[in-house]
Amino acid sequence: TSTTLQLAIGDALAVALLERRGFKPQDFRVLHPGGKLGAMLRTVGDLMHGADELPLVGAATPMKDALLVMTEKRWGIVGVTDQAGRLTGAITDGDLRRHIEGLLTHTAGEVMTPGPKKTVPPTMLASEALALMSDPAPAVTVLFVVDAGRPVGILHVHDILRAGVM
């Protein structure tokens, strides 16, 4: 019908104009942030918590102090950094259970799991970070956001879900 034809022509013109102007998904995200497609195009940097909320300690930090940071920051994880500020490992509740015997006699560097195995850059799409969190090897609820090996933020699965990224 003529209505269907008009819709098809309008769509074709819109697509041609988008291509000619070099319109990218990132442009759509900026212009329509409240919509479902805009939410799907949000980046980790848009949703992460900044440096002031990072639970970080040095490798030589006594476990008593590392536990205080873990409790104070309330993320359930503590990142361990080297002297240059690079993330070299993480301490989770699983690490605490594995080292429960004499835990307070250790340093953060002795208890940490080297890595951590899962980190994300601030430029990654939040939907990709959610997929990484869901990967069962192992599934995690918190990711450190790193830039050039240094932690710049932290992201919880609830931040992604609250933003409507699914």
Placement of each model-derived feature along the sequence:
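Short alpha-helices
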Residues: 1-23
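Generic structural signal for well-ordered, non-membrane alpha-helical segments
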Residues: 2-6, 10, 37-40, 59-63, ...
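Short gly/pro-enriched beta-turn/loop segments at secondary-structure junctions
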Residues: 10, 39-42, 49-52, 65, ...
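Internal, active-site/partner-interface "lid" segment
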Residues: 19-49
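Bateman (tandem CBS) regulatory domains
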Residues: 40-54, 106-118
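A glycine-centered beta-loop-beta connector
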Residues: 47, 70-73, 78-95, 133, ...
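The conserved cystathionine-beta-synthase
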Residues: 56-74, 100, 119-147, 158-166
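Helical hairpin unit composed of two closely spaced alpha helices linked by a short loop
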Residues: 74-117, 122
